């Protein structure tokens, strides 16, 4: 078994679709997401973010965190491991701001791939 560390990053949007896919495990790879860092770059607006993973190789999503509050100029860290099976997806997206302003959020994950 070979293992390697990977980094994944994303400019977080507001759509719960493939544009929010931060990482997808390869077809013959299992992965351990060691931590997810979600940074709100806005100096005025808080952000609410959602973190989801698939449980069946890419089609059925379950929330790891839902409407997680990230205050302005702050970072939220999900520091417990998330295990992904082959073809599973890690998705991060934000709820739209109530005042219709755009969200200014970035996400980063540290991942161990095992093949």
PLM regions: where:
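Short, solvent-exposed loop/turn segments that connect beta-strands within catalytic domains
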Residues: 44-45, 57-60, 100-101
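Short solvent-exposed strand-capping/beta-turn motif centered on an Asx-Ser/Thr pair
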Residues: 38-44
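C-terminal interaction-tip segments
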Residues: 1-31, 35, 94-115
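Short beta-strand elements bearing conserved aromatic residues within extracellular beta-rich modules
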Residues: 49-51, 107
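Intrinsically disordered, low-complexity Pro/Gly/Ser/Thr-rich segments with frequent PxxP/GP/PP motifs
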Residues: 57-89, 95
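A generic structural signal for short beta-strands and their flanking turns/coil linkers
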Residues: 32-34, 47, 66, 88, ...
């Amino acid at each position: 078994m070979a293992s390697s560390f990977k980094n994944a990053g994303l400019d977080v949007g507001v759509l719960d679709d493939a544009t929010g896919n931060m990482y997808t495990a390869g077809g013959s790879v299992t992965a351990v997401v060691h931590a997810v860092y979600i940074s709100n770059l806005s100096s005025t607006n808080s952000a609410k973010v959602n973190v989801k993973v698939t449980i069946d190789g890419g089609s059925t999503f379950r929330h790891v965190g839902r409407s997680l509050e990230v205050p302005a100029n702050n970072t939220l860290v999900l520091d417990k491991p998330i295990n992904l099976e082959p073809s599973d997806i890690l998705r991060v997206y934000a709820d739209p701001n109530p005042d219709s302003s755009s969200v200014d959020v970035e996400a980063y994950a540290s991942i161990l791939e095992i093949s």
